[in-house]
């Protein structure tokens, strides 16, 4: 992703003059990553060179995150560091949406600000910057959602792709700034999503990850009711072996959705459930009051319908007013439910959210201690869940390969990219090695808290094992 580019104007057929290279710095979540990929695609189509190395360009587009304070600080550090190197900046993403005027005032090197609903105009913005203008392109209320027709330059490698099924969120959780930064939910049509999935299949994608703010709410704004189940069934015809769903709000996992998880062969039984807490009073303060009656019942239903389900959740400790008894309720819930993967965060007050003004804040040292206690509680559970896979032969998507040792690193279906573990793969007795982007059968022989290990299984070995089992 570097160097200059020559291009032809799609409308006139005339050659475009060589245009400069633009560097990109990406921060934040995979939803933000898709926005970055669209900006890359638009600029490449317009004839610009694009690069992930800031040294290749004088101008850097920084797609920022503003979800929590730590993310904002990382974004600001990145901006200041690039500015001190003498780079000109186009600031995009959530931080731009959140603090547009302040950023323009405090960072003279910022030549443009581009909001979360305006990145489709990146070429026009860049041309204005090249003409000497200083640009503020931020819609007060984001309404745009990209579809399969918007150019895209993927950054995740050949085998894995994220597919955004909707943008924005209609919920108003007390701790979350995202609706303010991304707007209300706006879903793409099933036909649009399936069309892009087919495009990605043709590019060699082996794992497709469906994302939005609340994926189980997909379609409510467009069709009058959620239609995730229908979408999953439609994606069953796409030639991609793994389809993974992220951000499943618990109340949206209806019997129809669980049936789609069960019945559509390429939909993985991997459920990413951001439950946040277990205690009814804390959930009420989080403006998620309906969830308290759902958590345990839903998890029982999932395990009944999907016995092989892989369960991931995220939890928040130290929410304002969280008592020791309420925290112990959460600890008991975590110990009882035995999730495969858990992300635990301390509460971060965000300006503009209801939770930022709540009384009875929990001291940082107590919140951190609670987080540490939950992590300590979860580690042996995760280790045991991983150990239960020892002896199984599973498909592993190889993502890295060391030619000198033959070792490979990949993931099986129980691990999502970046947030979960990996599988360390030895080549096997026959020395079989495969390139990244390939799926290979692996017998799992080892496990720890986070990762698995194993060796490639030959066809002859699989035949012998099948005969022995009959």
Swiss-Prot record:
[4Fe-4S] cluster 1 binds at residues 29, 65, 94. InterPro entries: Elp3/MiaA/NifB-like_rSAM, Methylthiotransferase, Methylthiotransferase_CS, Methylthiotransferase_N, Methylthiotransferase_N_sf, NA-bd_OB-fold, Ribosomal_uS12_MeSTrfase_RimO, rSAM. This is Ribosomal protein uS12 methylthiotransferase RimO. Its EC number is 2.8.4.4. Its cofactor is [4Fe-4S] cluster. It comes from Synechococcus sp. (strain CC9311). Binds 2 [4Fe-4S] clusters. One cluster is coordinated with 3 cysteines and an exchangeable S-adenosyl-L-methionine. Catalyzes the methylthiolation of an aspartic acid residue of ribosomal protein uS12. Its main location: cytoplasm.
């Amino acid at each position: 992703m570097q160097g200059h580019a020559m291009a032809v104007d799609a409308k006139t057929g005339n050659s475009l003059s060589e245009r400069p290279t633009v560097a990109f710095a990406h921060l934040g979540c995979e939803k933000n990553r898709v926005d970055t990929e669209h900006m890359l695609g638009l600029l490449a189509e317009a004839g610009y060179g694009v690069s992930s190395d800031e040294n290749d360009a004088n101008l850097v587009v920084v797609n920022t995150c503003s979800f929590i304070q730590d993310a904002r600080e990382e974004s600001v550090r990145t901006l200041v560091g690039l500015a001190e190197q003498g780079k000109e900046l186009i600031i995009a993403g959530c931080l731009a949406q959140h603090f547009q005027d302040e950023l323009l005032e405090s960072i003279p090197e910022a030549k443009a600000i581009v909001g979360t609903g305006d990145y489709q105009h990146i070429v026009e913005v860049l041309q204005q910057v090249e003409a000497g203008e200083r640009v503020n392109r931020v819609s007060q209320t984001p309404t745009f959602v990209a579809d399969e027709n918007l150019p895209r330059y993927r950054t995740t490698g050949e085998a894995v792709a994220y597919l955004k099924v909707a943008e924005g969120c209609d919920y108003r959780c007390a701790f979350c700034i995202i609706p303010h930064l991304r707007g209300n939910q706006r879903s793409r049509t099933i036909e649009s999503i399936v069309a892009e999935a087919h495009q990605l299949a043709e590019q060699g994608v082996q794992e497709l990850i469906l994302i939005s703010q609340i994926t189980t709410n997909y379609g409510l704004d467009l069709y009058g009711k959620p239609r995730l189940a229908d979408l999953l069934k439609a994606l069953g015809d796409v030639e991609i072996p793994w389809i993974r769903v992220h951000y499943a709000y618990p109340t949206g996992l209806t019997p129809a959705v669980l049936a789609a998880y069960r019945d559509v062969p390429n939909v993985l039984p991997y459920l990413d459930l951001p439950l946040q807490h277990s205690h009814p009073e804390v959930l009420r303060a989080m403006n998620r009051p309906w969830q308290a009656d759902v958590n345990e019942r839903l998890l029982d239903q999932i395990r009944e319908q999907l016995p092989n389900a892989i369960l991931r959740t995220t939890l928040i400790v130290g929410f304002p007013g969280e008592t020791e008894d309420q925290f112990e309720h959460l600890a008991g819930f975590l110990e009882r439910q035995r999730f495969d993967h858990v992300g635990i965060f301390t509460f971060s007050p965000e300006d503009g959210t209801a939770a930022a003004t709540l009384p009875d804040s929990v001291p940082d040292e107590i919140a951190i201690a609670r987080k540490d206690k939950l992590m300590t509680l979860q580690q042996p559970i995760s280790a045991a869940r991983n150990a239960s896979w020892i002896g199984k032969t599973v498909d592993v998507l190889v993502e890295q390969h060391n030619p000198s040792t033959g070792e490979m690193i990949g993931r099986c279906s129980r691990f999502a990219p970046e947030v979960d573990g990996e599988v360390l793969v030895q080549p096997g007795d026959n020395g079989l090695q495969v390139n990244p982007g390939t799926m290979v059968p692996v017998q799992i022989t080892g496990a720890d808290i986070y990762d698995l290990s194993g060796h490639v299984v030959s066809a002859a070995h699989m035949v012998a094992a099948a005969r022995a089992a009959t």
